Each structure stands twice: as structure tokens, then as C-alpha cells.
């Protein structure tokens, strides 16, 4: 999934992608490995004709008048194409000048493509004040595109602080140096007592904003590289055969490719969030945090995915002639352009524990305010109802699951659902908690008879009926096609015998959704029927399973010749697989949308860090975990916005579920490891015992609702198109 969500952003990405394909095919990239790149490159004019050099610049200087998000979309496509030459450095340099003054006349030549600029994120330049200007001395090492540029935007140290200056290339001494990536030439820049007037000092550009702009836009190119590596590895895995089948059918390759797309999507979400934060001109801490998150994740994603792409290709990936050579080199140089890698996770920790993390909010169109006012009034009316009657009113109004069709829901659009959730939260009106029923109710609505709907849905929505899900079996786990619980037709119903396991909350449930095999001669996914089981029926025995935490959330359920009337068959006989697929889809959306209550949350983790003392290595690890946790939340936001835009939210939702559970485990592992010998204390009243509980409970999160390994298979097959197991 690219950065773009809105249709106009997708159109922009498509147009840039078309240009990149034309001007930077593989043969052009490999030619640039051997021979110097023309200056300006041959594509420069075509890019200027599309307005790409000035997409982010003000119309007052000939730009397109858009923002950093649009430029990030452009740079991601240039990264995907590993486009040679100075385009990315030049647009980042112009973004710095624009951040200081969007009407700066120097931007006119940059917007039109008549000039090329370069920048550095760090430098060894120092300045002393002389009248109204500065005198600059020193050296900046390994500046990308410096030898191709006519304008240089560089930081200088002065008075224990930092200023940014704009120098002409003919004022400095340039020493070209060999670049790891020949497509991105480097040069050392030396300044020998250069006098710089105050009109060349970017006095409105703070160090915080400058670094946020640079790191966000560099990160955008990184995710383009990562996406190319992921796509290329997956495509090769589909066609390369070993041992008589495509290598993409082997689970080891599937999991590697799924890990690549997961890491890429996480970094993409972070870049999108950072670019939006800067464009919103929100509080400094918000964009500082978001940009540091992007810089923590994106260059690592580019390096990991290009390395894995080489690995998937095997020997051919380790040749000079293969494109993997080009992209791995680009990833290495991009990572270097960020400066010290450890600075960014440290910055994440510093901002998170002082001014706070960037909030995750959904901004809706102002046209929705009338709808919001109406919903707010209805929520206020519900709040005025006596508490003992309120749940009935909420249920009858369709507020519990508003996306369901009337009368069970409100037939709410995605936008309405968001507003309803926001207004119930802000109005402090609590809706009945559906628990497992949140996954079962949609199946009853979709497949149930009128009698079944009337019998079960109203009391469930009122919170009076508790449900469990009787799917998994010993030996089969979540492999529903292999279930062996048997249902035999008898007069007026069915006799069911079997055993279910890992049934959450069965000891508290009045009803269960049960799958049983009704036709053993049918293919594995056929011959299964979906039953609604009264848990008080004779022959049903529930035995709690004590988990490694000492608690008993799961259960084994023994079903011994239990009679289930025909009226409790949901959907058609032998077609229960279809009904269960509806339930499982609801399960995945639900689990992927939040943090489990028994797992340490991101906010709890940051609070823990705020109260403790940690060394640099620990802070670096903590910053990485915070960045990953924040990006997982942004993935959820993107999933919601994709739904609003009519797109497919599945990739972001599936990957968010996969990543958020692993990150939650990471919080607990970090917390426990920080206690030293006290980590052995299991008293939940003590901080170490509390985090030990999180650590123990967290092992379940990568198992229930689909194990990590199964999720990786699903991601590889559904998102990357790798072949299914035979």
C-alpha cells in the first residue's frame, strides 16, 4: 500500500510512477553505475514539466502549492525507481528554504528546474558574527549531489546553537568522493572564511523543524526503496522454482516476504503521519515526535528489505548486473544521510516522556458537523435515561453495533460509525460490551432466521446474553477444515458429540457458536454446519484451562451426545464454513483494532519510562518500541481512512494486528529486563510483579485469533499473491 489514501494523492503517485518507469528503467540505472550522470539528468526537464520540483512550493514562486505530504508521495516513487541524480536532495533543500520563507525568490529557479540544490543534515561548519552577517569556515563531509548543485543549504554551529545558511556552489571548495551508491554522487564541501549576508541566513528555520523536514522526506525515499524490494522479492518467489514448485510456496520464503511488507507498511504509516504533522503546523513536539518515529523505522526498513530481497533471489541477487545491487546501495547511502542512527530513537523517547506523543485523531469533513450535532443530541438523550433502562434504549436504537442494518444497527456509514464512537466517548455514555458476541452477531444478522434474530439479538445487544465461540479443537487448533466434532441428524434436530478447546469465557457463557461436521464424506471445507448451542444443555461440560498466568480465560468444552434442535442451525446445513468466515472476518477486524487489556499498552510503557532511569542502550531500545507502537496505531488510523475513502482496509488492519501484538510483548520484555534481580519477584502489587504478569500474559497474543505464523501466511498469500500450500 503506497503512502497515498485520497484519490487525488493516488493520481499523483500514478503520474510520477509513469514518469519514473519511462526515464529510469533498469538499463539506465546500470549505465549510471558505470558512467557519470549527466547534469542535469536527462529526466530533469520532464519532471519540471510535471511540476514535480515545485510540488511542495508556494504558487508565489511558481510551485504547485501543495505540502510535504505530496512531496513525500513523489519522493517515495523516486525511491521505488532508484532514480539517479540530484532530484531528492534538491527538493529537500528547497523544502528547507520554503520552511523558512515560502516566498523566498530563490525558490523560483528551484521550482522551475532551472537550478539544483543540495543540503546536509549535519556539518562541521562553524560561523562567527561579522556585522549583520556571518563568516563561515569548516567542512561538510559526504554531501549528496553537492557537485551537481548551484545552491547549498547547510547548517553552521554558532553561539552554542545552529543556523542554516544558503551558499552558492562557486563560494565553496568541492571534493568529489566515491559513493557507495554511484547513482547518488557525494562531495566534501569546504568553506574558507566565506562571508554570508543576513539575507542568506534562514533565521526562521529552527533546528527542530529542519531535522523534521529532512528526516521525513528522506524516510519517504526509504519506503519507496523498501516497497520495491518487497514487490521484487515476492514476484521472484512466484516464478522461481525449486524442488518442483515455486519457492514462494515454501513457508520460510512466505514468512520472509510477509515480514518485508509488514516492515514496509509500518514505515509507510510513520512517514505519512510525519508529513501530515508538519503540514498541519501543529505543535513542535507533535511533528518532532512523528518525524523521529519515521526516521527510526524507515531507513531500517529500506536496509532490511533490500537485504532480504537479495536473500530471496539467492546467488543471482548477489551479482553486479541485478537491480538488487542498485537498491541495496541506495539503502546504505540513505541510512548514512540521516546521520547518527541512534539519535532518532533517543529523540522518540525524549519527546514521548516529556511533552508527549503525537495524538492519533481522525479529522472529518466540516460537512459532517450537522450529523455530529444530531448524534450528540441523541447521545445526550440516552445519558438522561435512568441507568437501569439505558442499555435497553441503546440496544433498541441500534447504537451497540451501528454498522449493522436496521433494526439491529443503524445502517451507519463508516463516517457515521466514527462520529458515533467519538460522541459516546466524549459524552461518557457506555455501550454494552459485546465481547465474543461482537464477532457472532453479524453472522446471526446475515444468516439467521427471523425467529433466531428475535430470540438472540435483542438480549445480546442489551448485554444480557454472554456468548462463546466453539470452533477450535484438540489436534486441529484453528484449522476449521480439520474439525471432527460430529453432528448426526435425528428427529427434530441433531445429536452432537465432540470436544472444543481454547474457548474463551465458556464458563460464563449462556450460548455458544458451534461448528460441527454434518457430512463426513464432503470435502474438508464443506459438510460443516454452524449451530447455536445452549451451554446449559445436558451433555455440555466446561472445564477451565489454567493458563501459565495462573488464570483461566480459556476452557475445554466436552459435548457428549448433546441435542440441538433444528431451529438452532444458523444458515444452511453443510454450509457452515461460509457463516464461520463471516465470524472470523469480524474477529480479525476486532482484534486488530486495539490493545488487549491484559497486555501493556503504549501509554503504560511510556509512563513506565517516565518514572525510571535507563542507560543509553535501554533508551535506544525503548525508542524503537515506542516508534513501532505508534506506527501500529497509525496503521489502524490509515485502515479507517481507507474505509472512508472506499479503499481496501485489509492490508493495514492485518499488518497492524501482527505488529501490535509483537510490540506489546516487547514492552513487557523491556519492563521485566529493567528490574534486574527484582524481576524474579512475582507479587502483582509490586511494579516488577505487574510487568511479569504482562510478560506472561503476552505470550497468548501471538497465538489467539490466528497465530503469528498463520497471519504471516495470510499476509504473504493475500497481500503479495504468493502461492498457497498445495
What are these regions (language model features)?
Residues 85-102, 432-451, 477:
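N-terminal glycine-rich flavin-associated loop
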Residues 1-87, 343-435, 445, 455, ...:
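Amphipathic, small/basic residue-rich leader segments at the start of a protein or domain
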Residues 113-123, 463-471, 515:
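A short, Trp-centered hydrophobic/proline-enriched beta-strand micro-motif
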Residues 2-14, 52, 79-80, 172-265, ...:
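Glycine-rich beta->alpha junctions and the first turn(s) of the following alpha-helix
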Residues 223, 230, 243-356, 690, ...:
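Extended, hydrophobic interaction surfaces within ordered domains
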Residues 25-35, 238, 242-245, 261-297, ...:
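C-terminal helix-coil-helix/basic helical segment that borders enzyme active sites and/or dimer interfaces
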Residues 2, 73, 92, 315-380, ...:
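Glycine-rich phosphate/cofactor-binding loops in nucleotide/flavin-utilizing enzymes
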Residues 133, 137-173, 177, 497-543:
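A short core secondary-structure module
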Amino acid at each position: 500500500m503506497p503512502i497515498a489514501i485520497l484519490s487525488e494523492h493516488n493520481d499523483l503517485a500514478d503520474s510520477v510512477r509513469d514518469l519514473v518507469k519511462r526515464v529510469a528503467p533498469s538499463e539506465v540505472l546500470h549505465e549510471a553505475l558505470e558512467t557519470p550522470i549527466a547534469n542535469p539528468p536527462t529526466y530533469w526537464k520532464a519532471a519540471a514539466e510535471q511540476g514535480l520540483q515545485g510540488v511542495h512550493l508556494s504558487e508565489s514562486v511558481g510551485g504547485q502549492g501543495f505540502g510535504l505530504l505530496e512531496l513525500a508521495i513523489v519522493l517515495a516513487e523516486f525511491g521505488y525507481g532508484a532514480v539517479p541524480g540530484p532530484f531528492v536532495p534538491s527538493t529537500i533543500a528547497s523544502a528547507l528554504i520554503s520552511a523558512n520563507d515560502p516566498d523566498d525568490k530563490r525558490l523560483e529557479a528551484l521550482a522551475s528546474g532551472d537550478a539544483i540544490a543540495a543540503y546536509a543534515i549535519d556539518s562541521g561548519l562553524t560561523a562567527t558574527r561579522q556585522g549583520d552577517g556571518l563568516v563561515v569556515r569548516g567542512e561538510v563531509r559526504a554531501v549528496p549531489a553537492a557537485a551537481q548543485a548551484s545552491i547549498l543549504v547547510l547548517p553552521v554551529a554558532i553561539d552554542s546553537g545552529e543556523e542554516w545558511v544558503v551558499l552558492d556552489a562557486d563560494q565553496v571548495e568541492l571534493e568529489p568522493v566515491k559513493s557507495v551508491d554511484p547513482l547518488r554522487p557525494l562531495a566534501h564541501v569546504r568553506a574558507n572564511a566565506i562571508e554570508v549576508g543576513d539575507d542568506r541566513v534562514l533565521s526562521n528555520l529552527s533546528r527542530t523543524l529542519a531535522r523534521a523536514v529532512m528526516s521525513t522526506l528522506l524516510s519517504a525515499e526509504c519506503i519507496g526503496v523498501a516497497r520495491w524490494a518487497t514487490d521484487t522479492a515476492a514476484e521472484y518467489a512466484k516464478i522461481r522454482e525449486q524442488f518442483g514448485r515455486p519457492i514462494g510456496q515454501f513457508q520460510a520464503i512466505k514468512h520472509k516476504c510477509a515480514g518485508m511488507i509488514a516492515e514496509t507498511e509500518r514505515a509507510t504509516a510513520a512517514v505519512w503521519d510525519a508529513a501530515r504533522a508538519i503540514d498541519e503546523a501543529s505543535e513542535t513536539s507533535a511533528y518532532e515526535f512523528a518525524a523521529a518515529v519515521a526516521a527510526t523505522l524507515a531507513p531500517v526498513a529500506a536496509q532490511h528489505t533490500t537485504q532480504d530481497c537479495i536473500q530471496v533471489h539467492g546467488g543471482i541477487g548477489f551479482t553486479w548486473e541485478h537491480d538488487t545491487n542498485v537498491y541495496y546501495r541506495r539503502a546504505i547511502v540513505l541510512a548514512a544521510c540521516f546521520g547518527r542512527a541512534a539519535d532518532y530513537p533517543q529523540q522518540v523517547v525524549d519527546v514521548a516522556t516529556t511533552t508527549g506523543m503525537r495524538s492519533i485523531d481522525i479529522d472529518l469533513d466540516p460537512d459532517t458537523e450537522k450529523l455530529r450535532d444530531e448524534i450528540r443530541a441523541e447521545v445526550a438523550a440516552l445519558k438522561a435515561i435512568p441507568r437501569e433502562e439505558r442499555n435497553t434504549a441503546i440496544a433498541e436504537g441500534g447504537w451497540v453495533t451501528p454498522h449493522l442494518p436496521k433494526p439491529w444497527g443503524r445502517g451507519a456509514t463508516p463516517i457515521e460509525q466514527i462520529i458515533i464512537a467519538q460522541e459516546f466517548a466524549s459524552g461518557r455514555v457506555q455501550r454494552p460490551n459485546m465481547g465474543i458476541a461482537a464477532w457472532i452477531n453479524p453472522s446471526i444478522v446475515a444468516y439467521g432466521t427471523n425467529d433466531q434474530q428475535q430470540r438472540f439479538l435483542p438480549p445480546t445487544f442489551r448485554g444480557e446474553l454472554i456468548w462463546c465461540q466453539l470452533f477450535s479443537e484438540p489436534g486441529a487448533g484453528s484449522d476449521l477444515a480439520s474439525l471432527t466434532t460430529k453432528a448426526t441428524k435425528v428427529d427434530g434436530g441433531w445429536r452432537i458429540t465432540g470436544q472444543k478447546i481454547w474457548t474463551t469465557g465458556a464458563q460464563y457463557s449462556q450460548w455458544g457458536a458451534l461448528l460441527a461436521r454434518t457430512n463426513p464424506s464432503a470435502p474438508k471445507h464443506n459438510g460443516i454446519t454452524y449451530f447455536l448451542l445452549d451451554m446449559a444443555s445436558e451433555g455440555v461440560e466446561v472445564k477451565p484451562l489454567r493458563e501459565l498466568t495462573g488464570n483461566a480465560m480459556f476452557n475445554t468444552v466436552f459435548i457428549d451426545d448433546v441435542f440441538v434442535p433444528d431451529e438452532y442451525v444458523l444458515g444452511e446445513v453443510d454450509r457452515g464454513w461460509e457463516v464461520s468466515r463471516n465470524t472470523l472476518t469480524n474477529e480479525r477486524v476486532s482484534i486488530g483494532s486495539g490493545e488487549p487489556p491484559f497486555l501493556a499498552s503504549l501509554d503504560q510503557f511510556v509512563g513506565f519510562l517516565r518514572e525510571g532511569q535507563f542507560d543509553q542502550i535501554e533508551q535506544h531500545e525503548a525508542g524503537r518500541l515506542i516508534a513501532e507502537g505508534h506506527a501500529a496505531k497509525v496503521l489502524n488510523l490509515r485502515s479507517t481512512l481507507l474505509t472512508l475513502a472506499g479503499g481496501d482496509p485489509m492490508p493495514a488492519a492485518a499488518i497492524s494486528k501482527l505488529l501490535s501484538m509483537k510490540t506489546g510483548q516487547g514492552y513487557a520484555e523491556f519492563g521485566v529486563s529493567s528490574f534486574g534481580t527484582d524481576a524474579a519477584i512475582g507479587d502483582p502489587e509490586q511494579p516488577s510483579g505487574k510487568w511479569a504478569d504482562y510478560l506472561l500474559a503476552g505470550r497468548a497474543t501471538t497465538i489467539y485469533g490466528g497465530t503469528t505464523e498463520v497471519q504471516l501466511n495470510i499476509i504473504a498469500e493475500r497481500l503479495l499473491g504468493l502461492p498457497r500450500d498445495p
